[in-house]
Amino acid sequence: MAFCTSLGVMMETQLYIGIMSGTSMDGADAVLVRMDGGKWLGAEGHAFTPYPDRLRRKLLDLQDTGTDELHRSRMLSQELSRLYAQTAAELLCSQNLAPCDITALGCHGQTVRHAPEHGYSIQLADLPLLAELTRIFTVGDFRSRDLAAGGQGAPLVPAFHEALFRDDRETRVVLNIGGIANISVLPPGAPAFGFDTGPGNMLMDAWTQAHWQLPYDKNGAKAAQGNILPQLLGRLLAHPYFSQPHPKSTGRELFALNWLETYLDGGENRYDVLRTLSRFTAQTVCDAVSHAAADARQMYICGGGIRNPVLMADLAECFGTRVSLHSTAELNLDPQWVEAAAFAWLAACWINRIPGSPHKATGASKPCILGAGYYY
């Protein structure tokens, strides 16, 4: 497939944009990806737009049942799509590109409800508006098709991780630490699979916001001042989600701040609770990998959690010498770019009619072409 550049030059490879805003709700990442049909060639640029505090509060409010939810969700979808369009425009400008240079834009949207047990997952984005604002063919609503085929609708990234990061000689694990942590297991000679291991940054961020009025614990500075509370850690690890077989997925519906508070007596040191939450994330990841990929010796990490040295130290301590920890940067993809790049890749799969569904990870009955497309 060829496309025209702003200078009218015909190119044989294609450019895609992926836009992702995750459960941390900190902002929107956009990544520029070059493809040759369904073949990945590389990521070439990135832009990030932080969420204004007001927008973030509105999104968090929508996590809980309340009045006028339908109207609020539609208005927020429009506001988000304007922010996504701004992020895409900044990315194009930074790369000296025009909208006609882009074959398609893949947009995940902002998850506000994830209920696979009821067959739905809600990501806010006004996709026709986004196509109109960007003047780029837009693909979105990626999770619904997998859910319709009986899957969890999550995680969607194992197929992308498989396409980029598989090693033909040994099992690799890819760990994404966003608000929720998820793993992709890439065994040689067998289909990839994966699942949500539990909270990633979500509880740590929520605790930091509640007790220090900061968006997150930068560089793990607050957690580093605390000590692990063994009894609290044990109670958190006893949650039945962690003993459920995969495929499985989770979200704020299960692991919110009010859930954590049911395990507290109110007298705990705030630094100690935060330190315990870091170990909680690390231990649940370690337990999941030990159960699902006991032969894995390498784990590649992406997502915002990689910037937290306390969490990284906890992971290293939990795994010991059994598994070596690496950044996806060692596999030529910046750890902050991976998730957004995945949705550019899924848009390319849609354009080329390639199933992008990791049905072995989600539990869907068959591979599916994910998403719906909107012309501008």
UniProtKB/Swiss-Prot annotation:
Its EC number is 2.7.1.170. It catalyses: 1,6-anhydro-N-acetyl-beta-muramate + ATP + H2O = N-acetyl-D-muramate 6-phosphate + ADP + H(+). Gene3D superfamilies: 3.30.420.40. SUPFAM superfamilies: Actin-like ATPase domain (SSF53067). Keywords: ATP-binding, Carbohydrate metabolism, Kinase, Nucleotide-binding, Transferase. ATP binds at G22, T23, S24, M25, D26, G27, A28, D29. Pathway: Amino-sugar metabolism; 1,6-anhydro-N-acetylmuramate degradation; Cell wall biogenesis; peptidoglycan recycling. The keyword ATP-binding applies. InterPro entries: Anhydro_N_Ac-Mur_kinase (IPR005338), ATPase_NBD (IPR043129). GO terms for molecular function: ATP binding; kinase activity; phosphotransferase activity, alcohol group as acceptor. GO terms for biological process: 1,6-anhydro-N-acetyl-beta-muramic acid catabolic process; amino sugar metabolic process; peptidoglycan turnover. NCBIfam families: PRK09585.1-3. Catalyzes the specific phosphorylation of 1,6-anhydro-N-acetylmuramic acid (anhMurNAc) with the simultaneous cleavage of the 1,6-anhydro ring, generating MurNAc-6-P. Is required for the utilization of anhMurNAc either imported from the medium or derived from its own cell wall murein, and thus plays a role in cell wall recycling. Belongs to the anhydro-N-acetylmuramic acid kinase family. HAMAP family: AnhMurNAc_kinase. This is Anhydro-N-acetylmuramic acid kinase. It comes from Neisseria gonorrhoeae (strain NCCP11945).
